[in-house]
Amino acid sequence: VLKDGRPRLRAAPLDPPFRIVLVEPEIPQNTGNIARLAAATQSPLHLLGRLGFRIDERSVRRAGLDYWHLVTLEQHLDIAHFRHRHPNARLRLFSAVAQRSYLDADFRPGDALVFGKESVGLDPDLLARMPDDVFGIPTLGPVRSLNLANAVSIVLYEAL
């Protein structure tokens, strides 16, 4: 926010940036929308494990529009491979079964914001190993979870 109270429309890039990490994403349109978000916020996008689509699939490209050339994209075998490549990135895990809200997370530039696959989320063993780093987005009523692209947007903009 500027001194006169008007919202700042353009943010300066963070160094180090927040990293968007998707573990085995299944729906190409979600990944395409998240890629556009990554481009808009200059946040690297990391895809881990087996994808439910080919990254060159038309639906992925279409959802990301013409912003793919602006996305820093890395693919990793798994979370261990990601951690090996980015040892200083603190993992912040997001899950529909979390007990704490994302609003309680202490975000720091350089954090890796980790989201699981659309159908089942993150591996329960990973969540159990890192209980202090697991957060969720509260929902009311019978809705179990939010769309992955929406969840990533909510968390990333809160972190920024």
Please give the residue ranges for each predicted region.
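Post-transcriptional modification and biogenesis factors for structured RNAs
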Residues: V1-L160
